[in-house]
Amino acid sequence: MVASTPCPGPGPVPTQELLSTNFLEAHKLVVELLLPSYSSDVVYCDSETYTKPIPIFGNKSIVSTIGDYVLSNPNEDVSYQMVSSVLEKFPLLFHCTYKTNEEDKGIPLWKKLYNKRKFKLLNSLLVHNNKNWTPVPAIPFDRENICDASGRSVLMSEIMSTSTFQTICKNNTHYLFDMLNMERGKQGGSFLHFFASRKNSFTNFENEEMDSHVLSNIAKFICNEKEKLDSFIPANGKIPCPDKTNDEGYIPLEIAIMEDNYPALLYLVCRYGASWANTYGDHNESLKAFAIRNDAKDCLEIIEFISDHYSFNKNVTKEEFVKEKTVECVGCLYDIEDEKRCYKLPCGHFMHTFCLSNKCSKANFRCVKCFQTFDDTIFRKCPPTIQWKMGINQTTNHKEMDLFNRAFDTYLDFICSYNVKLDKKSKPKHKPENKKVEEELAKRTAEIEEAMKKKEEELTKRTAEIEEAIKKKEEELAKRTAEIEEAMKKKEEEELSKYNKIIEKGKRRLNEECVKLRDISTAAINMYKEKVRINGVLLKDSDQELAEAKERLRKILLLEEETKLDRFLFRPKRVEERIFLTKDDETLAFKLALEKKTEDIIAKKNNQKGSERRDGEYTITSHIEKLPQSTALASVCVLNE
């Protein structure tokens, strides 16, 4: 690895001189004399960056120099302001081993600070945000326990405070779950085991009592920050299992009952989902029997509350149970031998009542066999655990969120009532010297109650005024609504009347147009009828003329035959007769032309009779043209007669 080279300075500065300077001078020296640039080896504790002697610091390493300063400085706030700048260049400064001399094996600097009870400085380092090295914590709380007799984690030490844990919940999800899952060094177990014992209570650097109520605070902060946890839950984002044993073989519930630590028992079941319906201890007994044997009187009332609110009763009759013959629990896979411990799920499968209670404690609300979700009847028997809250999608599953809030309200009501009961039970007899204080307190209480009563009266009066104002507004709104509806109705009627007039006018115009059209149609039909009648008359005349023409044709044909016979029998011998016939031929030719023209006129009139009739008929002209000239002349003579 390449070590960073210190910038040139005026010469070595004795360590004592550095330590004797005030904060501003020390800060200036550290900032100006530290290395202006560094390599990537600053992320390794054993790199030369942290171990190499620096001449300007009296040939001491940066770890020894800063360690000497913060260990000897009584003002921990000032120490933090100085080291916060140093950490920007040396992120693993407090991870590195601190040695007082060469023979000293040394321990990490942050543990040295703990041994010197620099709790406030360590607390500041715990939430320190390194801008240049964001993922690197200032102290390795996620990998090492504090160097004390029992090997506690940071969460179990004087370094931690309520506000600090809340800050970590808001700002660093990774740190949160790393801290929750750190186990105790020697006895093992998580923070659930540690705070389940009354013996482990202590006071932190802010004089806060760190006892079993830490369990409640942690659960509260995690649930309050659920929206942020929904957006990003890391791989280590799990709460330690409350049913896991420590190195001594105890689970947190057993530790709480053996020491009659009733708050821990309540928090473990209602907030962390500890399985309370199992058997406990060496005698294989119920939770209640285990508490009685350990003379845990305060815990008995907690167990009674848990049994009343979170236990399941049978919902299968004896006849149904006998009818099933063999009933297997889908939870433990053992046969259910008694219908009193049998619960039928909405999907039709069966479970032991105690198996179902333990399953719901873990916020597992599906049948393990068919994966059907449980119904509301089962949800109402579930404790308001962290796991349940973290598993609810608040934007879509409003119904389940309401069920959780209802369970949480029941839990809070019990805590309030039970605390009042314990306060009355454990209230000591007051000594005579406290009588004055009692009277003063009673007087002050009466004044507060009187003030509250007045406030309540004012609130009631104000509420009545608001309700009256709301009522008036509602009446005005109803009146205004009626007026608007009436105006809209009137407007609709006017629009409807207008449309009706338009429709009536259109109907009249339509009727007029229909009458005109009917008259035009009638006239056209009459004209057509007249035309048909005229065509019929013309056709009738044409038929008559055709019949007459046929008759004339028949006569012409007959005359032709007679003419042939006459010419054969009687040929004229005189010239005069031939001349006479020749003149007659001219006359006949003229008449024949006149007849042809007449037939053409008649044929034009008969064009409407169809092609078949015209093709089937022969005109007189066509027959006459086929005859010899002499025969034609004779035919004209016949026509003249």
Swiss-Prot record:
It catalyses: S-ubiquitinyl-[E2 ubiquitin-conjugating enzyme]-L-cysteine + [acceptor protein]-L-lysine = [E2 ubiquitin-conjugating enzyme]-L-cysteine + N(6)-ubiquitinyl-[acceptor protein]-L-lysine. GO terms for molecular function: transferase activity; zinc ion binding. SUPFAM superfamilies: RING/U-box. The keyword Zinc-finger applies. Keywords: Host-virus interaction, Metal-binding, Modulation of host ubiquitin pathway by viral E3 ligase, Modulation of host ubiquitin pathway by virus, Transferase, Ubl conjugation pathway, Zinc, Zinc-finger. InterPro entries: Znf_RING/FYVE/PHD (IPR013083). Pathway: Protein modification; protein ubiquitination. Its EC number is 2.3.2.27. One of its GO terms (biological process) is protein ubiquitination. A zinc finger (RING-type) spans 329-371. It comes from the Viruses. Probable E3 ubiquitin-protein ligase which accepts ubiquitin from an E2 ubiquitin-conjugating enzyme in the form of a thioester and then directly transfers the ubiquitin to targeted substrates. This is RING finger containing E3 ubiquitin-protein ligase WSV403. The lineage of its organism: Viruses, Viruses incertae sedis, Naldaviricetes, Nimaviridae, Whispovirus.
